């Protein structure tokens, strides 16, 4: 687990003038849904960080802590901050966070706000680039690059089941692949409805699914 913030320990070190920051103050959060990862009970989130200062010939540990007043996630139950580093001779790195699927996600989301900490390698991060929020849930949300017409969670689940892809459809497929997959989904829906006479596939609002 990554070392948390401890200002008393930090004061014992003689540091160079270097710090790290999350790479964008405008993109300071992410949502991780286990519904997009069927069968998985853990998920790895890698948050980009960038060095402020000079690269070093040695790897340098990234330290972070949970901001309790902005979080309802419980460390070691809902998440674990993993050992993370700025690698030698690099100005980029990632803060690694392992999130866990728990029963509570069936009823509510877990929110985790992290703060970058000073340590023996780095001074305090800029205030406006020191926080990052992760929201963990077990819901399906409207994905990037949706190309299948009217959206519903039932249709989204059907697409994931048959394509293995949960999001970013515009970027993972070429135009010809999009047409091919739409054709395959139309066939799959036909087969589903054929196997369920009188009970065709409907969305969560009772509307017939179509592609």
Feature annotation, model-predicted:
Residues 2-4:
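C-terminal motif of bacterial Sec signal peptides marking the signal peptidase cleavage site
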Residues 6-61, 68-76, 94, 102-111, ...:
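Intrinsically disordered, low-complexity regulatory regions in eukaryotic proteins
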Residues 77-79, 85:
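A glycine-rich, hydrophobic loop/mini-helix early in the fold
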Residues 84-93:
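Short proline/glycine- and polar residue-rich coil/turn motifs
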